[in-house]
Amino acid sequence: MYEEAHIDKHCHNNDLAMTFQAVVRFNQVIATCMEYAFYHPNTFVLITADHETGGLTAKEGTFVYTSKNHTSADVPVFAYGVGAELFNDITVENIQIPQTIASFMGKDDFGDQSTYQSLVK
């Protein structure tokens, strides 16, 4: 698991240059994960965000932030590997993502405290 929290931080500040640098770092991590998954076919890669921040839009060839806060915009979910087909062409709620990952580990009662304890051991 990897989180590039600086994307969110810099979007709150409407700082496009720093956001871009954070996205480049995130893309490098994604490339490493995808290469690993390519050579290890039982690997599942999931790329998403827990929310959108800043309302970044492109207007007349210029990128413009519309907010310094989280928005209600949907965020994409990209999946690769075993089980990726579960995320093809659908809209999911955030809670469905960890539930699906837990089910890959044989845990059907995600959210139950005992399940959480067994996953973090």
Regions found by a protein language model. Give the residues of each.
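Feature captures the catalytic ectodomains and active-site-proximal regions of enzymes
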Residues: 1-121
